[in-house]
């Protein structure tokens, strides 16, 4: 099974849009090998082709069955990639690929829904703690060389309302809950493991 990995070089207005983002989101041969080593029954059947942008896209996709990518040339994909069975988008969202009328018949497309939950939980926890502790006002006062006492009690015992407790909001709720804050949620169904 040939897997074509299409990485993107960073560019303004694109993804990734910084050199740091390119380093985070690039799937190197080592990263690919590390990811598949936990699945020896499958990994022995895989060959990978690591590519950049569309440098070798058409020639490599002639015999690729799997495409691992953020974006791709959608025009004439059935002709360019006649053996393609599966496209996996490395992001959680696929809105940039809409409308999906370009997907050849018989090709499955999947995404990384939930992959950003851990980082979103950390970012959300940081944001909640900063707001609770008046850090934006403290930073503004410091910049203005003003000293005002701004106090905050511990967050334990406070209530946080999370609007949307999918994978991202749920991760924030769990992180804040671990500090003793209660969570309210605004979703139509209860997510297991989140106390309301």
List where the protein language model places each region.
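Rossmann-like dinucleotide/phosphate-binding beta-alpha-beta segment
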Residues: 150-196
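N-terminal glycine-/charge-rich "phosphate-binding" loop or analogous flexible N-terminal tail
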Residues: 1-66
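Conserved beta-strand segments of alpha/beta enzyme cores
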Residues: 45-47, 108, 182
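Short beta-strand/turn micro-motifs composed of small residues
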Residues: 5-7, 69, 91, 164, ...
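Phosphate/diphosphate ligand-binding glycine-rich loop within oxidoreductases
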Residues: 63-139, 153
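Short gly/ser/thr-rich secondary-structure transition/capping motifs
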Residues: 45-53, 66-71, 140-148, 192-196
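Residue-level detector of alpha-helix initiation sites
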Residues: 115-119, 146, 159, 167
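Short, polar loop motifs at secondary-structure junctions
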Residues: 32, 53-54, 71-75, 92-95, ...
């Amino acid at each position: 099974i040939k897997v074509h990995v299409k990485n993107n070089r960073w560019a303004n207005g694109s993804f990734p849009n910084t050199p740091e983002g390119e380093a985070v989101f690039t799937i190197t041969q080592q990263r690919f090998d590390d990811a598949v080593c936990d699945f020896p029954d499958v990994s022995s059947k895989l060959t990978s082709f690591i590519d950049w942008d569309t440098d070798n896209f058409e020639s490599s996709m002639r015999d690729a069955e799997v495409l691992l990518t953020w974006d791709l040339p959608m025009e004439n994909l059935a002709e360019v990639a006649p053996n393609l069975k599966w496209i996996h988008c490395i992001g959680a969202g696929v809105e940039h690929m809409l409308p999906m009328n370009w997907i050849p018949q018989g090709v499955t497309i999947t995404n990384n829904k939930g992959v950003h939950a851990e980082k979103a939980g950390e970012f959300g926890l940081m944001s909640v703690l900063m707001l609770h502790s008046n850090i934006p006002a403290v930073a503004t006062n410091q910049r203005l060389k003003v000293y005002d006492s701004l106090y905050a009690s511990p967050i334990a015992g406070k209530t946080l309302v999370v609007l949307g407790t999918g994978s991202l909001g749920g991760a924030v709720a769990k992180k804040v809950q671990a500090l003793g804050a209660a969570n309210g949620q605004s979703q139509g169904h209860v997510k297991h493991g989140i106390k309301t």
